[in-house]
Amino acid sequence: MGHDSDVRADIAHARRLVVKIGSSSLTDDDGRVDPNQIDMIADALEARMARDTDLIVVSSGAVACGMGPLELAQRPTDLATKQAAASVGQVLLAQEWARSFARYGRTIGQVLLTASDAAERDRARNAQRTIDRLRQLKAVPIVNENDTVATSEMRFGDNDRLAALVSHLAFADACVLLSDVDGLYDRNPAEPGAQFIAEVKSSKDLKGVAAGDGGRLGTGGMAAKVSAARLASRAGVPVLLTSTENIGAALDTAEVGTCFWPDQDRLSAWKFWVLYAADSHGQLHLDAGAVHAVTENHKSLLSVGITKVEGDFSQRDVVDLVGPDGNIVGRGEVAYDSAMLHDLIGQSTSDLPEFARRPVVHADYMSHYSNRAQLKG
């Protein structure tokens, strides 16, 4: 892809598209679901689907939509109240999406995910199959974080990160992030002299960009959107960031907003999952020689280079690889459980019994944090 117009054309003609809608785009000033706003969005989504686009909607707004009926003037800060608001808002939001798409004879399917669903490969695959089957049955998947059962603070960032992960899970050709901002600026667009950034080819284009916080109803903020866009880019998915007001043009020609180019050295599906979605079940501490071997020479990790094992993990679990300075240098899938590894620490392969001579982490099942660092501006 040599030109910005090429990337925008790819987004405009994507056969499989993820569209994320922000909280503020779905509610009125009182924090209640806005049927007119949802109809406007559904109209634009339907126009794109009429072009044979396979479309997945990531809809924020459950907590925001529950605030009005529960008479909450401010977005709740404690987890229990957030979950209560989400439990009310999810029902109202799903009803409105169903009503609006029914005007076109379409059925919706609600897919509620948590961060732990993405972290476990089997659960991630189940979510992937559910989304795929909904599309095969001509239903519109409406994806949201399952805020009501989250056991930790909601960490997807107004579903921006969730949209990036869904783009990866669904093998999307492009992702559109919609909110109340028309694109990326080098500072708060309300400030004099703020410069619009039309395209982001790499993290170098983000140097000096100051991203603000989320609004009253949302939790994302521009920083979360940029991070999510770069995350999707690492999976090879181009991203368009713009306002919901521009949804028509965004889904038609993509000649609006900020365009994030996909990385040319896209990560494999497995390495992407390991770096950005999987939970770590433990840590392997490496000596300097092992760090050099796995990060610079792309070699497998052998037991002789391990100085310490932390955590209680099973064979094929994902673990962090930690250097002598305490910094995590990568992640990988272990060939042995933690109990067995304690007996292998520091031993040369030739000194081990035959059944224990496999690499502790094979190079094919390892991903380095140098890849992850590319997300940072």
From Swiss-Prot:
Its EC number is 2.7.2.11. Keywords: Amino-acid biosynthesis, ATP-binding, Cytoplasm, Kinase, Nucleotide-binding, Proline biosynthesis, Transferase. It is an enzyme of class 2 (transferase). It comes from the Bacteria. GO terms for cellular component: cytosol. The keyword Isomerase does not apply. InterPro entries: AceGlu_kinase-like_sf, Asp/Glu/Uridylate_kinase, G5K_ProB, Glu/AcGlu_kinase, Glu_5kinase, Glu_5kinase/COase_Synthase, Glutamate_5-kinase_CS, PUA. Residues 281-355 form the PUA domain. Pathway: Amino-acid biosynthesis; L-proline biosynthesis; L-glutamate 5-semialdehyde from L-glutamate: step 1/2. CDD domains: AAK_G5K_ProB, PUA_G5K. One of its GO terms (molecular function) is ATP binding. It catalyses: L-glutamate + ATP = L-glutamyl 5-phosphate + ADP. It is found in: Cytoplasm. Substrate binds at residues 60, 147, 159. NCBIfam families: proB. Catalyzes the transfer of a phosphate group to glutamate to form L-glutamate 5-phosphate. Belongs to the glutamate 5-kinase family. This is Glutamate 5-kinase. It comes from Corynebacterium jeikeium (strain K411).
